[in-house]
Amino acid sequence: MGLKHFIEKIEPAFLPGGKYEKWYALFEATATFLYTPGTVTHKASHVRDALDSKRMMVLVWLSLFPAMFYGMYNVGAQAILATDALGTLQQAISGHWQYALSHALGADLTLSAGWASKMLLGATYFLPIYLTIFLVGGFWEVLFAMVRKHEINEGFFVTSILLALIVPPTLPLWQAALATTFGVVVAKEIFGGVGKNFMNPALAARAFLFFAYPAQISGDTVWVAADGFSGATALSQWAVGGEAGLKHVVTGQPITWMDAFIGNIPGSIGEVSTLALIIGAAIIVFARIASWRIIAGVMIGMIATSALFNLIGSSTNPLFAMPWYWHFVLGGFALGMFFMATDPVSAAFTNKGKWWYGILIGAMAVLIRVVNPAYPEGMMLAILFANLFAPVFDYLVVQANIKRRRARNV
C-alpha cells in the first residue's frame, strides 16, 4: 500500500463526524505538505499563478537559508576568536554543552578551525533557539486551528525562522519561547490569524523581548557566545566614535565596509550578512512574493533621510555623519527591508501605498538610529510603526482614486 493510498484510506476518520475529527487540522497539514490537494472546482477557476500560499511560504522560508547558514558560521567564528583572545577555551568546553558537543564531534575550536567547525559550533547555538521557537509556535498554531476548526497555515514557517534570525545567539530558550507566544498569540491569533494581523508577528515578538528583557537582547555582552566577553555592535561603536571607531571587538582591526557587507562582525544571528540577505531577497522578488516597490521605497527614504542628517551635521552625535551605504549594511536594515517590510499581510496593498509605506520605514529607521540616544538600531520600531499606517496609506490612495474618477465624469 502506497503512502498516498494510506492517507486517502484514513481521511474519512478525520472529516466532520469521524472518530478523529478534532485532529483534522494536523491531518490536513501533513497530507497537503506531502501531496497536492485533490479538490477541484465545480466551475471554471480563475488561476493567475500556480504558486499557492503553502508553496509561497515555503519559498520564503528557503530564501532565508543563505542568511541562516552564514549566521551559524559567523556565530562560531566570532566565538572561537573570543575564546582564543580570552584564553578560556577549556573552561568553555567544560562549562557549556555547545562547546562540549562540538568538541566531542571533532570540531576544531582553535584559531585554525575550518568553516565546518565554525558552522558546527554556531549550529549548537542557533538550532536550539530555532527549534524552541518552531515547537512553541507550532503548538499555538495547531491549538488555534483545532479550536477554530480550520486548516493549519504555513505562515509560521516564515515567522519562526525570522524570529530565530533576529535574536542574539546567547538568548535564553525560555525567553525565546515566551517571545514566540507573544508574537503568535497576541500579535496574530487574537486578531484572527494569518491574513488578519496588522503587525509582523516576528517583529512584535522581538519588540516584546526588547522591552521586557533588554539585558538579553541588547548591550555589549550578548552578541558573542563566549563567557566574560564584551563587545559592542558596529552601530553602537559608530554612535560613540564615528567611522573611525569601527573596530573588530576581538582583533581590534578596523571594520571595512566589505567586512560589514559580507558579515564578518558580531550581531543578531541572521542580520550580519547583507550579501546573504540579497541572495535570498532576489529569490522572493523574482517570484513576485516581495514587492520591489516597498524595497525601493525603503531605500529612497533611508538615502534621503541620511543625506539630510549628513547635511545638518553634529559635533556631538557621530551618527549624523553616517552615509547611506553604511546604514544599508549595519544592524538589521537589510533583513528588515527585504523580509519584514515586504510582509504581504502587514504591509500596504495598493501600489502607491507601498511606495509611501516603504519611504516611511526608511526615513523612520534612520531617524530612530540617529536621534534616539538609547537605542542605535531603528529598523524594528520603524517597521512596526509603519504597520500601523499601512491601512491609512491604502485608504488615502483609494479615496484619491475615487475623487479623481468623480472629477473626470463631472
Curated annotation (Swiss-Prot):
Its cofactor is FMN. InterPro entries: NqrB, NqrB/RnfD. It is found in: Cell inner membrane. GO terms for molecular function: FMN binding; oxidoreductase activity, acting on NAD(P)H, quinone or similar compound as acceptor. It is a multi-pass membrane protein. GO terms for cellular component: plasma membrane. Its main location: membrane. The chain crosses the membrane at residues 56-76, 126-146, 156-176, 267-287, 294-314, 319-339, 355-375, 378-398. Its EC number is 7.2.1.1. Pfam families: NQR2_RnfD_RnfE. Signal peptide: none annotated. Keywords: Cell inner membrane, Cell membrane, Flavoprotein, FMN, Ion transport, Membrane, NAD, Phosphoprotein, Sodium, Sodium transport, Translocase, Transmembrane, Transmembrane helix, Transport, Ubiquinone. The modification FMN phosphoryl threonine is found at residue 233. One of its GO terms (biological process) is sodium ion transport. It comes from the Bacteria. NCBIfam families: nqrB, PRK05349.1. NQR complex catalyzes the reduction of ubiquinone-1 to ubiquinol by two successive reactions, coupled with the transport of Na(+) ions from the cytoplasm to the periplasm. NqrA to NqrE are probably involved in the second step, the conversion of ubisemiquinone to ubiquinol. Composed of six subunits; NqrA, NqrB, NqrC, NqrD, NqrE and NqrF. This is Na(+)-translocating NADH-quinone reductase subunit B. It comes from Pasteurella multocida (strain Pm70).
